């Protein structure tokens, strides 16, 4: 069986699946009690000091630069790929290594099922929740450095659904190509976005942008993928999220 590793980005203690396919990694330079032997994103070649704005991508960068695996993936300590089974304890729904391997026999990439915003496009949802200037910067970067990606970018921005959460599993050669492109776009975006003026939430700007860039890269490069459901280990408070979603849409005033 191929060597498959899914990094579990963590910044605090939390219950973890025991399956060997999962590799917890402490992000942002934190030291979690009881996890002294876990991976850390501030060792080797890293961008750990950017965790505030890059979120779980600092774990991805570390894995890309420092971890040898035939397939490498990224999940979050509160959300995982799930097996296809109704009901039961949320923790028991986390996909096993065997199930991840079976999914990879169908395609070289696993993505989470698409999130649908229904009444918002990817573009309008972003500018209502964050800052339009972020997307303006990305579009300019693509136009200047990666013009072949502009058609997919326009298509993705115009859709009401997309793959979110910065969750995926990729064959190593595909991951190398994706990370090379994505981190270059984000590095260029850092030169153009003044994230220091953002609050803590919007300061996670490069993590948010990467969520929207994944589909752009996948489509431009015609990468085959399969999807798995996502299990959230904590309650999602959908009513509260829905109310905030509509409130942002109604009150939007940014140019």
Regions found by a protein language model. Give the residues of each.
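ER/Golgi luminal nucleotide-sugar-dependent glycosyltransferases, focusing on the catalytic module
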Residues: 1-255
């Amino acid at each position: 069986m191929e060597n498959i590793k899914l990094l579990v980005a963590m910044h605090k203690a939390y219950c973890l699946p025991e399956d060997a396919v999962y590799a917890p990694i402490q992000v942002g330079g934190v030291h979690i009690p009881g996890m002294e032997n876990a991976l850390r994103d501030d060792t080797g070649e890293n961008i750990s000091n950017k965790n505030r704005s890059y979120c779980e991508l600092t774990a991805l960068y570390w894995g890309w630069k420092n971890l040898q695996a035939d397939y490498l993936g990224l999940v979050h300590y509160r959300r995982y790929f799930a097996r296809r089974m109704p009901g039961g304890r949320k923790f028991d729904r986390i996909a096993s290594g065997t199930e991840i391997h079976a999914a990879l026999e169908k395609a070289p990439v696993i993505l989470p099922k698409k999130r649908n915003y229904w009444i918002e496009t990817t573009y309008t949802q972003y500018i209502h929740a964050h800052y339009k200037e972020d997307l303006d910067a990305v579009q300019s970067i693509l136009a200047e450095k990666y013009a072949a990606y502009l058609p997919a970018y326009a298509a993705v921005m115009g859709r009401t659904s997309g793959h979110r959460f910065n969750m995926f599993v990729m064959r190593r050669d595909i991951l190398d190509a994706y990370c090379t492109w994505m981190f270059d776009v984000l590095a260029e975006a850092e030169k153009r976005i003044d994230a220091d003026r953002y609050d803590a939430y919007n300061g996670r700007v490069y993590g948010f942008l990467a969520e929207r860039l994944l589909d752009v890269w996948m489509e431009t490069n015609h990468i085959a993928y399969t999807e798995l459901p996502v299990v959230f280990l904590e309650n999602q408070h959908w009513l509260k999220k829905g109310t905030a979603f509509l409130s942002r849409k109604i009150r939007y005033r940014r140019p």
